[in-house]
Amino acid sequence: MAGGRSGSRELPETPTWAVAVVCAVLVLVSVAMEHGLHNLSHWFRRRQKKAMGDALDKIKAELMLLGFISLLLTVAQAPISKICIPKSAANILLPCKAGQDAIEEEAASDRRSLAGAGGGDYCSKFDGKVALMSAKSMHQLHIFIFVLAVFHVTYCVITMGLGRLKMKKWKKWESQTNSLEYQFAIDPSRFRFTHQTSFVKRHLGSFSSTPGLRWIVAFFRQFFGSVTKVDYLTMRQGFINAHLSQNSKFDFHKYIKRSLEDDFKVVVGISLPLWFVGILVLFLDIHGLGTLIWISFVPLIIVLLVGTKLEMVIMQMAQEIQDRATVIQGAPVVEPSNKYFWFNRPDWVLFFIHLTLFHNAFQMAHFVWTMATPGLKKCFHENIWLSIVEVIVGISLQVLCSYITFPLYALVTQMGSNMKKTIFEEQTMKALMNWRKKAMEKKKVRDADAFLAQMSVDFATPASSRSASPVHLLQDHRARSDDPPSPITVASPPAPEEDIYPVPAAAASRQLLDDPPDRRWMASSSADIADSDFSFSAQR
């Protein structure tokens, strides 16, 4: 066998043990990954994290889509490499500062490598023609798509983790709502001036009241104390007043966590518009434009703008409280409305966050791919310092979006006109099942009590036995024959007898049994519903 072909043996020239070992490793790794995802999905279901289970299903769908793309690239590699285009068309819109000689040298190198592998360059047979994409470039593109999917899922998981970490201290604020101090603060009999409340003083200070400076204050506030205790408690009270009863025991913190999980299953996916954004960035990556440099700052601008807008929403709610009344009763109450958000659409904020995460993952995946692929580092990183700045901006953007903007979004967007009813579906079903179970248990107890009461009535007042008693026979017995006859008179009806054995318990039981059972069951059921505690399950 020739020495030049020793490193490029085909399958018939490869030992069977080598083929078996490689196949076994690939199969075992794939099965382990599939089994791990399956167990993770079951763990989410057991922990009653339906939204996280849906997010995991979305990740599985992304992996399946990635598998389809990989399959298409593998199958279409040979046909695409046979699509020939003129060299003049191949020399425009290049991403690198490479001249015609460098391109031809690289093409010649590709032809030599393909020829050494036992193949040949189909388009080299034609004068002035080159392949649309060579087999090597398609292989590199294949790797980039895989790296992009991995980075996007990783960034979304990091975003969820940092967001939950930021929201941990909100749980302490939620627990304080059961304290006497908080109940005194929201006491309806307590009157205060609106401008003296902590919420209004925080958001309507000297600089916050100036129209031109409000946006500047909101911009810097997102970095320093984006959400405070007074903000959380005020928006919590406004949400409860708008969508629930004021005295309901509602865990607003758990609701926000479930809402964040529900949004996570949207963020973790790569929709068709996002794929088009990625394709557009690849198209605009032309040498001389510096597309990958200046476009890396676009997600940063979007995140800063979104954070500023969310802070402005809080300021607008504080302004409406002050404009509505001079004196407030109890706690200041905000009125949720979609008018605070862009185009009356709170979900647009989530779209911008989704776009930011995808674009940031795209930038980092492109950096890692070009640095790790031989021959691409010199092309895409001519100025290494600009590339380092790009990486620093990407990492800072990820921390800012995950730890500040995403939790702020989860809280402020609850001030929209509508609440997420999909989150309540599971909780409503649980509440109805618990209510049904308690109602059936109480009905069994009532039936047993009614049966015992009926039995006590039967034993305490036996009408048939009393009518056959000798005492009653003696009352109706006629006078003896030796007694003097008495004048015939019309007998008056006997006075009603008093029972010598009064049974007040039996009378009470008789009064209880006089009520229709349906009315008694409905009254008890209505009381159960009114006293029920509609709160989220503590099992997390």
UniProtKB/Swiss-Prot annotation:
Q: How does it sit in the membrane?
A: Multi-pass membrane protein
Which UniProt key words apply to this protein? Calmodulin-binding, Membrane, Pathogenesis-related protein, Plant defense, Transmembrane, Transmembrane helix
Biased region (Basic and acidic residues) positions are: 474-483, 512-521
The portions of this protein that span the membrane are 17-37, 61-81, 143-163, 266-286, 288-308, 348-368, 384-404
Alphabetical GO CC annotations of the entry are: membrane
Q: Where is this region: Disordered?
A: 468-526
Compartment list: Membrane
Sample GO molecular function, one term: calmodulin binding
- Which ranges of this chain reside in the Extracellular compartment per its record? 1-16, 82-142, 287, 369-383
Which GO BP terms sit in this record?
A: defense response
Give me the Cytoplasmic side stretches, as residue ranges.
38-60, 164-265, 309-347, 405-540
Q: Where is this region: Calmodulin-binding?
A: 426-447
Q: What is known of its domains?
A: The C-terminus contains a calmodulin-binding domain, which binds calmodulin in a calcium-dependent fashion.
What is the stated purpose of this protein? May be involved in modulation of pathogen defense and leaf cell death. Activity seems to be regulated by Ca(2+)-dependent calmodulin binding and seems not to require heterotrimeric G proteins.
Which family does the record claim for this protein? Answer: Belongs to the MLO family.
Name of the protein = MLO protein homolog 1
Name the source organism: Oryza sativa subsp. japonica (Rice)
